A protein has these predicted regions:
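Conserved functional hotspot residues at active sites or interaction interfaces
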Residues: 1-145, 149-172, 196-346
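Extracellular/cell-surface secretome signature
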Residues: 171-197
Length: 346
């Protein structure tokens, strides 16, 4: 048994969902009383150069309606993804994609999962503990804004095998030059990737919040400052005509419609207000941020650490107590706590 406030680590065998695939790959975690659970991929960064972690949402809080948040694909073979997990038999999942997707296989039926283009919609039949993983198919593709609708509650994860933050590798399609310097010739983002993206990419993952849990008021707190790097924030709207403001002002944010999103960078702490429900993601910057990756690290760059994915919690869902794990094989560990003035924290 686990005592109140105690923390226990369980190492699970690998059950990779690699590429676009539908297969029975999920693990089930069940307890006799309510618990808090997290997953680390992997826990201590052993035998890999990249990892991330996610809070796991209990099945009674899952939903049927989601929008995906992740980062764009920045390498040929390291892709963005959305993962859907069924918790009941005969779950129908409809996916409206926002990016070109990789061809894959439905292991249950042996059928091919065909390539999709932005705006395409496809339905999938999942049984209990089936995993549907859909990945992007080209550099610059981003699954953010993909809509998930299901007839039963599902768990949805968004992430990337390895993505950058910030992105400094885009090709200006009109001028045919790389954005970061306005001079290097390009035809596509792939012409600006290897040399000009801010080092280094990292694995990203988060279990996403169903739309029914989104809020309209958030507090954004800069992650532990390593140097002059800025965090990247992404805001996605659930409804049309969503007006977003920040206090103090951080960026010019357009009116967002359903499934639309906006990115901006900030080194400050600030409030986010919206007229309709939004989801807010925070991405830690790479070790060579804030400068483009020209000659490696420059003065003022973070110098350590790479992108990680955090989902902000709306103010109305703040809690008074938390249990969390900091793995013991990292050079730096820190926790960020946001509280009202005069609050005691221990």
């Amino acid at each position: 048994p686990i005592l109140p406030g105690e923390l226990r680590v369980y190492n699970l065998p690998r059950r990779d969902a690699d590429g676009t695939v539908l297969a029975p790959l999920a693990y089930r975690v069940q307890s006799s009383i309510p618990i808090t659970a997290y997953q680390f991929n992997p826990l201590d960064n052993e035998d890999v150069f990249s990892n991330d972690a996610s809070l796991l949402i209990p099945s009674n809080v899952l939903g049927k309606y989601y929008f995906v948040m992740t980062r764009e694909q920045t390498f040929d073979d390291l892709r963005s993804f959305v993962t859907v997990v069924a918790v009941r038999d005969d779950t129908t999942v409809n996916v409206d994609v926002s990016a070109p997707t990789l061809v894959g296989t439905n292991v249950r039926t042996g059928e091919t999962i065909e390539h999709m283009e932005p705006g395409d919609s496809r339905s999938f039949h999942l049984m209990e503990y089936d995993v549907l993983n859909i990945e992007t198919d080209e550099i610059g593709s981003d699954m953010s804004g993909t809509m998930i609708l299901a007839n039963r509650n599902v768990a949805v994860f968004g992430g990337s095998e390895a993505s950058n933050a910030p992105n400094t590798n885009h090709c200006d399609k009109q001028l045919k030059v790389c954005e970061w310097d306005g001079e290097t010739p390009c035809e596509s983002n792939s012409d600006c990737t290897s040399k000009f993206n801010t080092c280094c990419a990292d694995h990203l993952e988060q279990q996403l919040f169903p739309v029914k849990t989104w809020g309209q008021h958030y507090l954004a707190s800069k992650a532990f400052p390593r140097n002059l790097e800025k965090d990247v924030y992404r805001i996605i709207a659930a409804e049309n005509n969503t007006v977003v403001t920040t206090l103090p002002p951080q960026a010019s944010i357009p009116v967002l419609n359903q499934g639309e999103w906006v990115d901006f960078e900030s080194i400050e702490n600030f409030e986010i207000h919206a007229t309709r429900p939004i989801m807010v993601g925070q991405f830690l910057a790479a070790q060579d941020a804030p400068g483009p990756n020209i000659d490696g690290a420059q003065e003022g760059d973070a110098g350590i650490g790479d992108p990680a994915f955090i989902l902000l919690v709306p103010n109305e869902q703040f809690r008074s107590d938390y249990v969390f794990l900091a793995p013991n094989r990292y050079e730096l560990d820190y926790v960020t706590v946001v509280v009202p003035d005069g609050t005691k924290v221990w």
